[in-house]
Amino acid sequence: MTPRRVAKLVQFSGSYLNTEWARKFILGSLLQRYNPQSLTTVGSSAAGNSGEDASLDKELLHLQRSLSEVWSLPAQPLDAVSEGRILRLLARYATGEGVMSIEALNELSHVLSCIRGSPQRVEGPIDMEELLLAIGYAKPGDNLRRVAFAGELQYPPSALAHMRAHLRDDMERDGSDPFDILRVVTHNPAYAIDSASTSEVDDAIGVHKDPVTGEECFVVYVSDATVYCPFDSPLEQLTARLLTTTTYLPEGVFFMLPKPIVDAATLREDRPCRTFDIRFQIDEVTGELKNYSVGVGWLHKLRRITYDEVQALYDEEAQVGNQHHHTERESTQASPAKREEGKKGMVASGGTSSCRPSWMTVEDESILRRIYRAAQKRYETRQLRAGDRFIHADLPEPLIKVGAGAQVLSVEDQIIGTRDARLAVAEMMIAANEVCSRVAQENHLSIPFRGTRELSLDHVAAKSYREPHGVVSVQSLDPQYVFFAEAMQRSIRQLSGVTRAVYFHTPIYHAGLDTHNYTHSTSPLRRYADMLVHHQLKVWLWRTSHCSSGGGVLHSAQKSSPVLIEQPIAEHTMATLCSMISSKQEQSSILQESSQRYWLLKHIKQNILTKSPHHRFICLVGDTRSVKCAPEYARFVVECSHDSPSQPDGGVHRTVPWAGRWKQRHHEYLYVSDIYITELQFAHVVLHSLPDVVVGAVVECEVREVHPTQGYLSLAIVKVWSGGDERRFEPLWKKCLLPSLDS
């Protein structure tokens, strides 16, 4: 009997597109998917182009047959896996993040030259972007980085079938969850401080006084998401474990958990909510945490408030304080009537409540102010403890809104205008995460600890980087003062010297926070690691309560719950999960950062330059270096200009070697400046020959060239403001920075 022959499917699995696979892609994908209509906007009727389409189809079919005979390859469709990998490879090249082999580019260019109306050659990323649009891999205006993302952004539809078991009608009733017997009911108010657009509320802050000692205690109430998405359940495996994080992109939010689960677990004002509670006290002298603990509870009184509303409250307090100080200083020389009039004016100007929620009382204001003062103390403590190692990571981040048709609707500030309110929330969350880490370490629990890896060779090089010979730093307008843009550049340099934070199953040092006691526990609706922390600590709470009850079994509404609850995640399993989460979250973070840049540049090209081609951006100078004595800089830029998307000389073939051209040329620029574009909250590098562009200066820049998909932006300085530094012109550049804030 003749043995059965099994044909093995060979798939493209590498990152190098050689000639053979390039030809397979051309025959099995490019010629079958090519459609020049994808490059044009909808305008002409389909009937008018039907004849041309039929003619093009015949040409493509004839070309496919001819190439199949010449190359001795079958003209059959590529398998989905190979096609997807090759398309992602081409997309990475189109976005400027990857490289392509010369042989593959030559094969593609040779075939395209035979197709009527197609890009004649694929020589650079912009040509590749047009090719991907022509074969329908992406639509005009699409974020190509998102389209080519290799990770998962959405859970499979089959996950929705597993939700019903966790969304029963009785789940809102006390006793339907095994841990309800351990929950403590809280009737004190808790404040959820978020953006106005936030739909998933997973944390709130409360301040209570111990009835016995009278000491102040802070409580961070976190949504108990593991009630509705338990560890190792089919729902958890297909959603949270698969995605590991919610990905926030300007064009949309890709949730880690299904919307019904988020709606059930989120903290709400209209019903009691199950919470994971983190309690701690802050030493008023040292600022360190003390008397901390974790538990579970019911929250009955949630108060939602936005960052803008809290910031207005803090600004009002600062304004009243300044007026009070000014009034006291002048009242010594004023009559009694004048003093009384001044007091009335101070109260009138400081007592506005137009932007406050209707529920806010004097006691609520006092609690919110107390949260801010405690956060300031914690921030100062961390800064003092870290010393020179302290990293200021509060960089600006614009809020970009994208509408239908890939249209950028707005670019607004979401950090600088509400900095104090965000500091209050951030420090409370950092403290809560530190408490969870300490409790886990003290009880030998394996959780996803958060920290930074040891420095790689690239980070060591960045940390010890020195400018090339001949580069000189230009002195600031005021060497004794740290300007806004200057402080930002220092933070960027500090961050370049540390690695991205990762998760590890044992305690790990966090360079950014200068501590070994850190994890993530306050955002379980958007981070899988937080759910794992909750699971481990809740199992420990169950076991602790079981032991304290004399060995008796705690009763529950679910018969099988004691067996499930008493199973913590094994250390080797936690190690595997931490590695997986770190990898996926890093991919998501890179996608979010690159997408922010893409949509910002798209906003420049789509909205600003179409209305005003010579629009001038107000920019702050954060650093300037003189390179007129550093020939390496000039030589490097000449080579870069050769590879740039546009050639000033029309791409004429040069016969003089690059080294020879460099020796024959003068310097094209004398200075390199790091600037900050206030209108876009965007840091950039500008090359120029203007000696007045120094740290602290305010300049105006015009756009020379912009390519959003490639992340390419070229600016030219056209004016330097005279008569002062950025402090004098602060109202003008802040007006560009915060155009959406009436305050």
Swiss-Prot record:
Keywords: Exonuclease, Hydrolase, Mitochondrion, Nuclease, Transit peptide
UniProt-recorded Gene Ontology molecular function terms: 3'-5'-RNA exonuclease activity; exoribonuclease II activity; RNA binding; RNA exonuclease activity
Catalytic reactions of this protein: Exonucleolytic cleavage in the 3'- to 5'-direction to yield nucleoside 5'-phosphates
A family per Pfam: RNB
Residues annotated as transit peptide in the record: 1-67
Primary location: mitochondrion
Keyword set includes Mitochondrion: yes
Subunit structure: Component of the mitochondrial 3' processome (MPsome) complex composed at least of terminal uridylyltransferase KRET1/TUT1, 3'-5' exonuclease DSS1, MPSS1, MPSS2 and MPSS3. Within the complex, interacts with KRET1 and MPSS2. Component of the mitochondrial degradosome complex composed at least of 3'-5' exonuclease DSS1 and helicase SUV3. Within the complex, interacts with helicase SUV3.
Family stated for the protein in its record: Belongs to the RNR ribonuclease family.
Name of the protein this chain belongs to: Mitochondrial exoribonuclease DSS-1
